[in-house]
Amino acid sequence: MALKHYNPTSPARRGLILVDRSSLWKGSPVKALTEGKNKTGGRNNKGHRTSRGIGGGHKQKYRLVDFKRRKWDMPATVQRIEYDPNRSAFIALVEYEDKTLSYILAPQRLGVGDSIVASRKADVKPGNAMEIGQAPLGTIVHNIELKPSKGGQLARAAGAYAQIVGRDKGMVMIRLNSGEQRYIRSDCMVTVGAVSNSDNANQNFAKAGRNRWLGRRPLTRGVAKNPVDHPHGGGEGRTSGGRHPVTPWGKPTKGARTRSNKATDKFIIRSRHAKKKR
């Protein structure tokens, strides 16, 4: 998908750059593959605000996307590529030979009418899913499982991908976009190709309202508040906060390490933080 640059016919159009979605499906999603979605406004079940900057936005239906791809050896045909308000990537509606419909993440270079298949070993072709241990070295993949049959968890955002760089004792080594290298079990499923809509990050919304349509509220800096409202607040004149960045509740933020799953540290060959540690 290309980027669309708008002429400044009004202040809200000056500098506006959006992804050209003219080739996407213009109708409604498949009703059987959608669910209702309640907005939380960033509040938990007690009504306490746990996430800042969330609220409002256009009403959305949740699309049931198949991240598992476990319908073995049954070819499917791409019916259409659709916009999905719940994620940055596009989704593809596919119809299997038994006439069942399913949504999958749309990879780059996948078009209407293309045939795809999920198998233990499949051709290296965008949209095909296979066990990562069967894919050749150097293959670009996305929607990567961390546990067999759990469904893809890595490389699902727009433009994301990982590359297979090696094999070792029933494990496969992959390199992620972040620079992290890690082991994945060879019987985990992956989908060939990079995720669609790689230009998503290059958009310029040009006005605050477009962020509000997406449910994003303005965020006030802590240093602009009073001491009662934020740990960075107060001070005479402009100050820098005087401490490492924290949330309104005093917890470290902006790059602070929060990873606590020590059990899977052994699968990480090279941390994405390796450059920062030097």
From Swiss-Prot:
One MF term from GO for this chain?
transferase activity
| One GO term describing the cellular component | large ribosomal subunit
**What family does the entry list?**
Belongs to the universal ribosomal protein uL2 family.
Matches recorded under Pfam families: Ribosomal_L2, Ribosomal_L2_C
Q: Which GO terms describe its biological process?
A: cytoplasmic translation
Its domain of life reads Bacteria
Cysteines paired by S-S bonds: none
Q: What are the record keywords, sorted?
A: Ribonucleoprotein, Ribosomal protein, RNA-binding, rRNA-binding
Q: What is this protein called?
A: Large ribosomal subunit protein uL2
Gene3D superfamilies named among the record's database cross-references: 2.30.30.30, Nucleic acid-binding proteins, Ribosomal protein L2, domain 3
Record note on quaternary structure: Part of the 50S ribosomal subunit. Forms a bridge to the 30S subunit in the 70S ribosome.
